[in-house]
Amino acid sequence: MTEQIKVSEVSSILRQQLEGIHTSIKLEEVGTVLQVSDGVARIYGLDNAEANELLQFDNGMEAIVMNLEEDNVGAVLLGPTDQIKEGDTVKRTGRIASIDVSEGMIGRVIDPLGNPIDGKGEILGETCEMPLERKAPGVIFRQPVNEPLQTGIKAVDAMIPIGRGQRELIIGDRQTGKTSIAIDTIINQRSNYEAGNPVYCIYVAIGQKGSTVAALVNTLQEKGAMDYTIVVSATASDPAAMQYFHPFAGAAIGEYFRDSGRHALVVYDDLSKQAVAYREVSLILRRPSGREAYPGDIFYLHSRLLERAAKIINQPEVAREMNDLPESMRDKVKGGGSLTALPIIETQAGDVSAYIPTNVISITDGQIFLETDLFNQGTRPAINVGISVSRVGGNAQIKAMKKVAGTLKIDQAQYRELEAFSKFSSDMDPITALTIDKGRKNGQLLIQPQYSPMPVEQQIAILYCGTHGLLHDVPLDKVQDFERSFIESLQLNHQEDVLDILKTGVIDDNVIKAIEETAAMVAKQYL
């Protein structure tokens, strides 16, 4: 006779069995690709997707949500379009598009997603997740620009000074030396790095040829600048979406250094290509177009990017309350850091009144305008002093430079005007002739070879000679010879009593006397 199981025993057995089962439910919102073309996918089923959220396809490729429509979302692909097809499944990640930043990135070449592309292996070190899109620091978390960022270029440091935390536009036609100014500025930070107070540089190459970027990285390595530089590259062959998000990756890396109390410089080369990439993506997403077929928010694209450059208040307790601060950075925040931006814009036939140039001019704190005519005449850097300006950099200029070069910008502008009139007149009064002679010689002093930044103390000494008429007896074609001999003489005889004092920003009577005596001695050979 079989043993019968009582009802009460059945319930206790079932209870024991159920207690041994552990289940975890994980919900994933999954959508389906309706259509894919030209780097953009339309996806159905992701009703709760957020703007700028990262999506993931079955094959591991990622996309970023840009359009939120009634029954589908438009996402830009961060990879080749041919790897995605209609009907593929895609899931939400719940993460806003971001880049993992670490100290190991210094000296490396990476793509906009933070992946190394220089063949030197994985990037090591503790990482911080920095969002690509982030609100700029509010006014309460900033302090005025009051610390100089020396470019090593005489014409810039004397007449259009740049301060840490400033946004200074470099604008001009193609092949006028825009990138050269930015690269010289990066190379000039070598002295800060050696002094133990580095300015970390991020060079963002947007839509350039891979060979051009490789040559540039090679130059930075030869000059020892890769020790404190990160190169972020999205080449012309990369999808438009990568070129569009590319500058935001550079800004996020710069913010990592800025928020941790250090100084950073980011070069966007160039934002014209980003604007074209954004126009392409927007038109494919069927957003309404405006002037020159750019979308209506093209101004906001550049303003929200460039406003992230700032000098942060030197109070850590206030800086920690900064808006939109990533959680991964909260315990690393220190005050007093800065992020300086040098955006580059390419003009067509010198037209600064076009849509994108006028937008970026109105966003930035000044512009360095380069002219093709000056470049072809041999004036390099080919800076048009008349319409180049630095609105806040004057407060950051060191006192000795301000004292020596205070009138240089006006003098050179007047010289350009008088020189134009002198072509129509056969006879000139002595004062006009003297002004033109001085202007020409100062123009020769401001010419500088590429990749040869000059320390600020040497700049002050040689510019004193130009602004105070000490080149009167030097022939025009010998001005650059005079400059070399003068600097060599100062280094040999007056390193401590002149150059070391000028480095501190002080210029006194003893320094002036030594400069004038050295200039007179060197000028004798030209009499």
Predicted regions and their residues:
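Acidic-enriched and Gly/Ser
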Residues: T2-Q17, T23-K26, T32-L149
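Phosphate-interacting basic helix/loop segments used at nucleotide- and nucleic-acid interfaces
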Residues: I13-S24, T151-V156, G250, L305, ...
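P-loop NTPase nucleotide-binding/switch module
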Residues: D88-V90, A97, V101-G104, I117-R167, ...
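Walker A/P-loop NTP-binding active-site region of P-loop NTPases
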Residues: R164-A215, D270
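Loop/turn-to-beta-strand initiation segments
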Residues: P198-Y200, D227-I230, G261-L265, G336-A341
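Nucleotide-state-sensitive switch-loop elements of NTP-binding domains
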Residues: V199, K209-I253, I284-P295, H302-E307, ...
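Phosphate-binding/switch loop-helix module in NTP-utilizing enzymes
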Residues: M242-Y278, R330-D331
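Conserved catalytic/coupling modules of large nucleotide/cofactor-utilizing molecular machines
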Residues: Y256, K273, E280-L527
